[in-house]
């Protein structure tokens, strides 16, 4: 089993979503789907991690978006 964990933080609000998949291909598809949205997001902080069910991190990415001046 593989887990995809998504964390969003905007001001004082935090959202944490966890998805589980039976195979790695489906999990990686979800991981990259979240990344494509996170790259363009206006949420202050956006993270996504792909883990095994034993807790081993396969890949992880974290975006910090700052307000444009």
Please identify what each model-predicted range represents:
Residues 24, 33-38:
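Conserved short hydrophobic interaction patches
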Residues 2, 19-21, 31, 62-63:
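Aromatic side chains
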Residues 8, 22, 51-52:
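A structural detector for beta-sheet-dominated domains
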Residues 13-29:
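A short, exposed loop/beta-hairpin motif centered on an aromatic-Gly-Thr core
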Residues 1-7, 30, 34, 49:
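Broad hydrophobic/π-residue packing in well-ordered secondary structure
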Residues 1-17, 43-45:
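Short aromatic-glycine-(Arg/Gly/Cys) micro-motifs in beta-strand/loop hairpins
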């Amino acid at each position: 089993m593989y887990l995809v964990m998504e964390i969003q933080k905007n001001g004082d609000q935090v959202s944490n979503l966890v998805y589980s998949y039976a195979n790695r291909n489906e999990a990686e598809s979800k991981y990259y789907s979240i990344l494509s949205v996170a790259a363009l997001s206006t949420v202050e902080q956006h993270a996504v991690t792909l883990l095994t069910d034993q807790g081993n991190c396969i890949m992880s990415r974290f975006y910090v978006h700052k307000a444009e001046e």
